[in-house]
Amino acid sequence: MSNTGRIPLWLVGLVGGLAVITMLSLFLYGAYSGLGSSL
């Protein structure tokens, strides 16, 4: 942990994974709500 100037790889993976999960959940929620409202 000597390279404090760089962002840790696990932190990048964690943030990236959370962002992907959030975007996927929002996309699925929007698709389901759109289909429900259209039907």
From Swiss-Prot:
Record key words, sorted: Chloroplast, Membrane, Photosynthesis, Photosystem II, Plastid, Reaction center, Thylakoid, Transmembrane, Transmembrane helix
GO cellular component: chloroplast thylakoid membrane; photosystem II reaction center
Membrane topology note: Single-pass membrane protein
Subcellular location: Plastid, Chloroplast thylakoid membrane
InterPro entries reported for this sequence: PSII_PsbJ, PSII_PsbJ_sf
NCBIfam families: PRK02565.1
Protein family: Belongs to the PsbJ family.
Name of this protein: Photosystem II reaction center protein J
Biological source species: Trieres chinensis (Marine centric diatom)
